[in-house]
Amino acid sequence: MEDYRMVLLDIDYVTVDEVPVIRLFGKDKSGGNEPIIAHDRSFRPYIYAIPTDLDECLRELEELELEKLEVKEMRDLGRPTEVIRIEFRHPQDVPKIRDRIRDLESVRDIREHDIPFYRRYLIDKSIVPMEELEFQGVEVDSAPSVTTDVRTVEVTGRVQSTGSGAHGLDILSFDIEVRNPHGMPDPEKDEIVMIGVAGNMGYESVISTAGDHLDFVEVVEDERELLERFAEIVIDKKPDILVGYNSDNFDFPYITRRAAILGAELDLGWDGSKIRTMRRGFANATAIKGTVHVDLYPVMRRYMNLDRYTLERVYQELFGEEKIDLPGDRLWEYWDRDELRDELFRYSLDDVVATHRIAEKILPLNLELTRLVGQPLFDISRMATGQQAEWFLVRKAYQYGELVPNKPSQSDFSSRRGRRAVGGYVKEPEKGLHENIVQFDFRSLYPSIIISKNISPDTLTDDEESECYVAPEYGYRFRKSPRGFVPSVIGEILSERVRIKEEMKGSDDPMERKILNVQQEALKRLANTMYGVYGYSRFRWYSMECAEAITAWGRDYIKKTIKTAEEFGFHTVYADTDGFYATYRG
């Protein structure tokens, strides 16, 4: 038995001898940064049942021959609640049996039955992706779920996070170019003519069937060899992160289809598995076991407000530089004409270099959000900000002993969709040129309102006797004590952000300040997301009353502040939500 330290990059589970086995993919920090797959057989799935009659519920559940039953005291929207923790043999048993449990007469409700097994493991074990893990284990010669020579370890002791983040990650970017004489590329007939790759591991090249006179071009025999050479590079380098731009919806689906037509092998996974494309909402998501695939296109759509999100436009906005651009509908012409082909090669290389530069600038924030939310980077990079906030709260709920509310039913969702909270107060800007302007704004207005007014579904009450904060306009009442679940969590976020900003002030190290700035920016984004998701129809902690109360207090504060300013001789020329501009007239 040995001690291991690894940076956790990816996680899933497989079934071995009818037993669910969690697989942890990472780089072994105690052994030369080698890839390693750790198998943990100790964890089992579970859900909670809220009984109407505890003894009767236990009796009915025992008849179902479940793996294990345990009575626990938890909180349900702040109320002490006795629940039964129901353990299962396998994750696939949960959807098979949960409806039978829900339908028992002695069961009022079931909870946390829709949390994926690998996410449950991360939450319960307090393990954070992109951080170092420590565990004891025994290296095995082979494992049924691994067909490569990547080291495999059977976990024999507790797996725990060290709290140390991942540094010096190996990042590889890629991009394909297609000969498209008929317009939109068609993988059934239009060949891939080059694949560019660039990384921080000293690799920068374009693979193609031509161009041997250029020193950055690696020439192969045909398209099949082109695809297999790309696969060979990914398998050999085993980057921690593989980045593309629109690679979920274009590059990888195209590569996969061309490989199938040509009979090329694309077993890129650390375990020997093929790349896998799945649906995530309205888009595709392509996964490689072990290596984290990040598509920067949806990431940039979340973080930037642009007229269009082409690679060229995003690159220019981030760096103030123009990258090489060619007309997409004429790329085939640049390939077919000898005098133009070199331009296409340089365009291909510029694409992957630009993608890599964008990744180096954007990924630190995503890595920090991964550590905060506690879910894999693969998922975080594809989550809307509201989903990130929800999974952050799910993780915190486990720590607080709170039951996680269920997702809304279709009927609940439909009834919620029509409701919209009134937004912040806006005074349209006065036309003209204004001088001697002063600006006033509230710092973290909505998060501060949530904390100061204790706005949370578990503090909302109709009780006229309780000591409450009463929302303007609506009259919603929120108990002053105890502190609600969501205000408590947001309070933690803001306190940690203040601590980090103080640490930044005291640091003279530019690199440390840069890291700390990314951390506080991630906390800021998370805190500012919280108020908005109260009114999101699919949010587990949905409460239109909370959403309306927050913006009502916001409007009240800004209007009162403007009125006070005007009493002192200021004239407001523009106001929006959490601040205003004014001129002084005396």
UniProtKB/Swiss-Prot annotation:
Gene3D superfamilies: DNA Polymerase, chain B, domain 1 (3.30.342.10), Helix hairpin bin (1.10.287.690), Palm domain of DNA polymerase (3.90.1600.10), Ribonuclease H-like superfamily/Ribonuclease H (3.30.420.10). Its EC number is 2.7.7.7. Optimum temperature for DNA polymerase is 60 degrees Celsius, functional between 60 and 80 degrees Celsius. Exonuclease activity is higher at 70 than 50 degrees Celsius. GO terms for biological process: DNA-templated DNA replication. GO terms for molecular function: DNA binding; DNA-directed DNA polymerase activity; exonuclease activity; nucleotide binding. It catalyses: DNA(n) + a 2'-deoxyribonucleoside 5'-triphosphate = DNA(n+1) + diphosphate. In some Methanobacteriaceae the PolB protein is split over 2 genes. Formed of a complex between PolB1 and PolB2; the exonuclease activity is associated with subunit 1. Probably binds replication protein A (RPA). In addition to polymerase activity, this DNA polymerase exhibits 3'-5' exonuclease activity. Belongs to the DNA polymerase type-B family. This is DNA polymerase PolB subunit 1. It comes from Methanothermobacter thermautotrophicus (strain ATCC 29096 / DSM 1053 / JCM 10044 / NBRC 100330 / Delta H).
